[in-house]
Amino acid sequence: MNKLSAPRAQHAVDPVELTADLVRCQTVTPEEGSALKLLSALLSEHGFQCQRIDRNGIPNLFAIWGEDRNGRTFGFNGHTDVVPIGDPKDWTVDPFGAEIRDGILYGRGSTDMKSGVAAFAAAAIEFVNETPPDGRVIIAITGAEETGSPDGTRAIVQWMEANDIRADHFIVGEPTSLKSIGDAIKIGRRGTITVFLTVTGVQGHSGYPEKANNPLPALVDLLQGFGQAAMDEGTEFFAPSTLAITTIDTGNPARNVIPATCKATLSIRFNDKWTSGKVLDWVSRHTRAAEDKFGVTISADHYLSGECFFTPPGALSKLVQDAVEQETGQRPQMTTLGGSSDARHLFKHCPVVEVGLTGETLHQVDEHVSVAEINALKTVYGRILRDYFGSEGKI
């Protein structure tokens, strides 16, 4: 393997300009807004083979450089879709104007996560053209991460596997830093499952409760039990799993009618002690006990946003930590904080770590990112690529 050195500047792509170009694309999820077309044209110009992997109307882009299947394959995952802007009158700038003021770039998606996509694309273009590695570099971008669509990153991974394309390692460019770029990376995230409870009793007149079976006491008792039951005490890298009661509803406008049904919603975030199946079994034990106690029927439908993912500390996380420390001067802590990300679709394919900017203004009015941070992230990604392909089999 050739010794890899720092890239020269002749193939430089300005990550700030690319971020601005992407922000100007109005990509409120799941609209493509020409962002993937822009990326595809740029990457193709610099030697990447690009293919759209759209599924059920969801836009996705797969780009790969290199044809050496005997070498290692390194992947980057990100998204170009953004959340809605809310009321434009609340913004002090054009949400899609990409205005730069006093070293700050403003716009929806500037933090989450068009700057991350731009930084890696710029770093990868320089790397593969100036120090071509023995291996392949993949850039997998979806236009529907914010909706949690199963036709986004998951569709790309399924297409890769169906076409015998396997990455050895992936990084995801979500904002992971806490206060300053490089202070944290994510090696895992909690799983998320929403449970929709429906308790069914017997409707009746509130003046004759003996002729009815009110489902509300059963629901109240059940929810109290959930509130008092700790799922676990946490693990080495994860905080305790949590259950939040987010809705309670009878749909009953009459004050003198005992309702036939009542409903509640549970939002459960679970750590690496659990799978979604184990969580549902735990919920079922509680609902069966309430059925027996109150003589009601309880159904529990669910929506799984994603399983918990965890990449144990090892060669990949150390390489990323070392690269970040070399470029920023601080060694990032390994965390599992936050909600779910598209890493949940990648962790069964290969080891995955998340590394990106700070996220203090993501999804907020006047979302913005420091120009200096975008440039710094590009250098971090460039260092990761050089160290990865120059590690002589250490990872």
From Swiss-Prot:
Catalytic activity from the UniProt record: N-succinyl-(2S,6S)-2,6-diaminopimelate + H2O = (2S,6S)-2,6-diaminopimelate + succinate
Annotated binding of Zn(2+) 1, by residue: H79, D112, E174
Active site: D81, E145 (proton acceptor)
Protein name (record): Succinyl-diaminopimelate desuccinylase 2
Natural source organism: Ruegeria sp. (strain TM1040) (Silicibacter sp.)
GO biological process, one term: lysine biosynthetic process via diaminopimelate
Function: Catalyzes the hydrolysis of N-succinyl-L,L-diaminopimelic acid (SDAP), forming succinate and LL-2,6-diaminopimelate (DAP), an intermediate involved in the bacterial biosynthesis of lysine and meso-diaminopimelic acid, an essential component of bacterial cell walls.
Pathway it works in: Amino-acid biosynthesis; L-lysine biosynthesis via DAP pathway; LL-2,6-diaminopimelate from (S)-tetrahydrodipicolinate (succinylase route): step 3/3
Major enzyme class: hydrolase
